[in-house]
Amino acid sequence: MLSRISTCLGALILFIAIALAAPIHLAAQAHYGVVELGELGGTAGSANGINDRGWITGTDNLTGDLTTTATLWLNGSAIPLGTLENGPNSAVAWPVKNNNGVIVGISELPDLDPLGENFSCWPFVGTGDPTGRICKGFRWQNGQMTELPPFPGGYSSYATGVNNRGQVVGWAENGVHDSTCDPTFQILRFRAAIWQPDGTMQELPPLPGDSTSAATAINDLGQVVGISGDCGIAVGGVSAKHAVLWENGVATDLGNIGGDAWNTPTAINNHGTIVGFANTAPGTARVYEAFIWTKAGGMKSLGKIPGDLRSTANGINEKGDKIVGLSRGGPHLFRAILWQDTKLTDMNSLTVPGSPFLLLAGDIDQQGHIVGEALDLDTGEGPGFIATPVPPGTIVSSAVHATPQGTLSENVRRQIDRRMGFASELIP
């Protein structure tokens, strides 16, 4: 691992020297030098967000790969953010864009849920199996992790995003026993939530006729995106019957691309452009593709790599011309992908020689840096990565790297599935 990091860092220093020696002209398609991020003792990690200060956030496995911790990477080094009340697992599972030092995510508590629930957090942490523990959203700043409470009567909450105004979004249980829940997993109703900087909490209602809602991202204008549907098992599926946009607390249906489940926005920029993934046919089977939504054009599929099964869009830049995500072809076939002006490219065709194989792209910042999860072909480990645009003329891959299908360890595969909340086969 250290030798590969040294090689990649050396390559980046060379890129900088080239950049200083000659003026840079923007190319139609960027190419990338890749650096693996530090690990915390385990064999897999995922960089899920990057802000405009270069703070990278995500999740990393601890020694033994049985527990995960919310992680901040600064200058490539991993900093564990800890857990609430010394609970076993935590994660930053969604892109966090705040530039003022605020990070949000989820943490399991040591306590078991009094109702025997398995709330929404479990697929994103640990081994991706039900734990029966209470889970709370958290707000982290200046080394301090603070709990984000549920609505009255509830036990658990989940935080996904925070804007530069300090508004945190996610979802939280209330005290209502919901008949649309699958009681083997979830009993209490949950609703989309905004936790304001002053500590107050606001509910964002579902669409008329739906039971539950959840918020997944917020921009600096206070526009919130998320899902509306039935309770189910409180993870995707029927809880995402509709992709929604809340403006001033009012929900608008964003439409669909043929499906009535898994309609999930993942990010919204300050121009109101939304990306995510959505089913292409009725039913809860995972037949989703990445989508882009604009006010002028509505929801449109971004497609997937030909022959693959599904795709997701995970992050978008402010200009809206670059989107990053994942194309998946099977249990061991994952590829980080980039859409530039909606044209899809396997990122492994854009990297310098000696780069690791890029499995998943989680987010992109305004300078074009992309973060995600890679496969180190020497060690078999799956560290987080940052990909940095390189000057034109730098030697890059002439073709897509040979796809390392069948070589992914179970820990690496599960870490990628944890990024999307699919680490367990119990998710329908």
Q: Where are each of the predicted segments found?
A:
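Residue-level hotspots at or immediately adjacent to binding/recognition sites across diverse folds
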Residues: 2-428
